[in-house]
Amino acid sequence: MQHFNLNVQYTEANVPHGEWLDWVMGRAQCKIVGIIEPDLIPLSRQIVLNSINLAYQMNSFVGCAQVSNHIPPAAHIFASPAFFFISTDCYQRMGKPSFLEMGRADVAEEVSYRAEEMGIHYRTLFPTHFEREPLEGIWRLSSYGYYGIGTVFGNQVYHLFQSRYDTNADLFIQRCDDVVNNRFSMEGFRPSI
């Protein structure tokens, strides 16, 4: 984030993702909380600033569109925590929903379910391109299209996914280098729709 001159608070904790998100939100003392996972690269400073502003102006949240393909109905599009900005007022209005995985929800999906049930509008960035299929096969984004390893959302953020695999980690290092050296390109990527 230094490349974009953005001040970031990094944390290192060996806890489940949803538990960590609950911990962060439970201690938030600012108007907007932003989460950027370590395998996600904003492609510009402006997308971060725009997302902060959008969450503030809407008194809601914004995130990358995702579907939990392993949890029925495998069609619910929600704002994933990979790139996620939420107003703390909105979070409190919703009754502080947990980010933990639940029967119907993957990590952070319950937040979107709660917003939908309460009639709170939120925004998602949809995938535009991706580099390759995951080992288990391509991921469907409900009826919208597809995403996979190295997905670009809204032409503005790059999310690697599955960084635990060495080949993906090498790809991520390359993409970080591309962004820092102003040569990131989606040439050779597959369209999501």
Residue ranges and their predicted role:
Residues 10-12, 65, 126:
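Residue-level recognition of beta-strand->loop/alpha-helix junctions
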